[in-house]
């Protein structure tokens, strides 16, 4: 270290006042980079955080704007030590601003995260233990409803991001960080869209509220995944409870058309009226229309048969009357015939006697007849 300080004597100030100020400090304790290297590292770190979209949009003090300049009295330390301290400084700034950073945007290795956890205070370690127990209880309570969502988010998050989220959770618990209102707003919106959810929806909402509370305390992606899983359960329950409303809407739509309208309406007009209706409702209405048409056809056939029977019966009555009239005519003609026959017989018998009496007189006219 002495040789490095000797090599950098040209960088030290020459004024007596500055030398007295420098002598008040133990220069052997300073193992930091030079100002240009530190500035480049801070700028690159800020660019990576801004590109990841993890900084807050509110006008607050950020790590990049409030970083104090590093003194340039000593030479840069070896590469391994500088990288390790750079990671530790990143964790220092990250724990100072838990509500502005996104742990998934930081590309740290698990070893660096473990070292950062070890270097933190015992209070932060206790916060991490509480967060781990809360995460285990949340995972056990979520069960089958949010298990898939938690598993998927855990796989996407990775071990490094999980440890980073634990550090942020402990810092947020220590400093009383702001809760994540995004999850609660999401669940409230879900309840607004599905106000008629039954028991499954209520269970999903309860799990979603528990997951949202875990997200407010932890602030990590695992809590966010649990909240998403609970919200999905509530949505599924609400969707299952909406089927009676669809059925009620179908009954109301059935009242829209009377039986006469369904029968008299053409197929094209009916299809135009049924646009936007579910397939089951269309099939049911068309089946009802077919049943009504068949019933009407059967009734018309029955009416025609009855009408034809009445016509045939009336014609039969007319024919019977005509037969009776003809019978009466026949009986009258028979009586006339009998009368004429008797008269003829009388005339014949009387004429034969006259012929016998006048046969001797050939000059009589009856003789030549």
Curated annotation (Swiss-Prot):
Kinase as UniProt keyword: no
SUPFAM superfamilies in UniProt: A DNA-binding domain in eukaryotic transcription factors, Leucine zipper domain
Protein name in UniProt: Transcription factor Maf
bZIP domain boundaries: 284-347
Region feature Disordered, mapped onto this chain: 57-82, 175-243
Function: Acts as a transcriptional activator or repressor. When overexpressed, represses anti-oxidant response element (ARE)-mediated transcription. Involved either as an oncogene or as a tumor suppressor, depending on the cell context. Binds to the ARE sites of detoxifying enzyme gene promoters. Involved in embryonic lens fiber cell development. Recruits the transcriptional coactivators CREBBP and/or EP300 to crystallin promoters leading to up-regulation of crystallin gene during lens fiber cell differentiation. Activates the expression of IL4 in T-helper 2 (Th2) cells.
Gene name for this UniProt entry: Maf
Region (Basic motif): 284-309
Quaternary state and interactors: Homodimer or heterodimer with other bHLH-Zip transcription factors. Binds DNA as a homodimer or as a heterodimer. Heterotetramer of two MAF and two USF2. Interacts with PAX6; the interaction is direct. Interacts with MYB; interaction takes place weakly in normal T-cells and increases in T-cells following stimulation through the TCR engagement. Interacts with MYB; the ternary complex formed with MYB and the CD13 promoter is regulated in response to differentiating signals. Interacts with USF2; the interaction inhibits its DNA-binding activity on the L7 promoter.
Post-translational modification remark: Ubiquitinated, leading to its degradation by the proteasome. Ubiquitination is triggered by glucocorticoids.
GO molecular function, one term: DNA-binding transcription factor activity, RNA polymerase II-specific
Superkingdom of origin: Eukaryota
Keywords: Activator, DNA-binding, Isopeptide bond, Nucleus, Proto-oncogene, Repressor, Transcription, Transcription regulation, Tumor suppressor, Ubl conjugation
Biological process, per Gene Ontology: cell development; inner ear development; lens development in camera-type eye; lens fiber cell differentiation; megakaryocyte differentiation; negative regulation of transcription by RNA polymerase II; positive regulation of gene expression; positive regulation of transcription by RNA polymerase II
Lineage: Eukaryota, Metazoa, Chordata, Craniata, Vertebrata
InterPro entries xref list: bZIP (IPR004827), bZIP_Maf (IPR004826), bZIP_sf (IPR046347), Maf_TF_N (IPR013592), TF_DNA-bd_sf (IPR008917), Transcription_factor_Maf_fam (IPR024874)
UniProt feature, compositional bias: Low complexity: 72-82, 196-211
Biased amino acid composition, Basic residues: 180-195
Tissue: Expressed in the muscle, uterus, intestine, kidney, liver and skin. Expressed in the lens epithelial and fiber cells.
Region (Represses ARE-mediated transcription): 126-369
Ubl conjugation recorded as keyword: yes
Record's subcellular location: Nucleus
Start and end residues of each stretch annotated as Leucine-zipper: 312-333
PROSITE patterns: BZIP
């Amino acid at each position: 270290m002495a040789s490095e300080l000797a090599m950098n004597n040209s960088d030290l100030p020459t004024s007596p006042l500055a030398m007295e100020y420098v002598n008040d400090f133990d220069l052997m304790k300073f193992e930091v980079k030079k100002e240009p290297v530190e500035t480049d590292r801070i700028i690159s770190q800020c660019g990576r955080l801004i590109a990841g979209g993890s900084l807050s949009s509110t006008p607050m003090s950020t790590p990049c704007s409030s970083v104090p300049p590093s003194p340039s009295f000593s030479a840069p330390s070896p590469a391994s030590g500088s990288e390790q301290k750079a990671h530790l400084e990143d964790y220092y700034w990250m724990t100072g601003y838990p509500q502005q950073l996104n742990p998934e945007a930081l590309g740290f290795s698990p070893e660096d995260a473990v070292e950062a956890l070890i270097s933190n205070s015992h209070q932060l370690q206790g916060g991490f233990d509480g967060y781990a127990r809360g995460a285990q209880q949340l995972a056990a309570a979520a069960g089958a409803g949010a298990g898939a969502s938690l598993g998927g988010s855990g796989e996407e998050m990775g071990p490094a991001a999980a440890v980073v989220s634990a550090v942020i959770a402990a810092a947020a618990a220590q400093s009383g960080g702001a809760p994540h209102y995004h999850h609660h707003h999401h669940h409230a919106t879900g309840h607004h869209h599905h106000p008629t959810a039954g028991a499954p929806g209520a269970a999903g909402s309860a799990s979603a509220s528990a997951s949202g509370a875990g997200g407010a305390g932890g602030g990590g992606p695992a809590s966010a995944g649990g909240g998403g899983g609970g919200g999905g359960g509530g949505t599924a329950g609400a969707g299952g409870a909406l089927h009676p409303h669809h059925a009620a809407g179908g009954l109301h739509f059935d009242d829209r058309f009377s039986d006469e309208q369904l029968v008299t309406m053409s197929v094209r007009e009916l299809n135009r009226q049924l646009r936007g209706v579910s397939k089951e409702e269309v099939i049911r209405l068309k089946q009802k229309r077919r049943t009504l048409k068949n019933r009407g056809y059967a009734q018309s056939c029955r009416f025609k048969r009855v009408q034809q029977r009445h016509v045939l019966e009336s014609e039969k009555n007319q024919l019977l009357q005509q037969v009776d009239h003809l019978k009466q005519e026949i009986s009258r003609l028979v009586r006339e015939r009998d009368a004429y026959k008797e008269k003829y017989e009388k005339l014949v018998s009387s004429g034969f006697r006259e012929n016998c009496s006048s046969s001797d007189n050939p000059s009589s006219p009856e003789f030549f007849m």
